[in-house]
Amino acid sequence: MNFFDLHCDTLYKAVTEKSELDNPSYEVKLNNNSKSHRLQCYAIWLPDTLDGNEAEKLFFKSADYLKSECNRLGIELLGIGEFTDNAFSKYRNSAFFTVENGKALNGKIENVKRFAKISQNNDSHME
């Protein structure tokens, strides 16, 4: 069976609580069945109380954290255009990074390209 799951607050909790993504109190379930595939989308939720600088910083911190956790857990972090082609055909566990709030842009149009770059090749935001 192929399974698609959207996590709206798991990534935020893991980052802000300094916990592991597979913490049993979260709803992340890894697929151990080689005949099925699981795609889990991790949205970075940004509270309305954050100012633009804090939201931008939390976005990049979350992107780095998700990449690290996917490496640790053996989850394939997919880039733009990959998820529909590969998630249910190649990988037992895959993930897609999303953002839930435009506040992460912090009023900087150049962040659109920076965010896309992270999604295209899973690079860190550091250059």
What are these regions, as identified by a protein language model?
Residues 1-126:
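N-terminal hydrophobic targeting/anchoring segments and the immediately downstream early-domain regions
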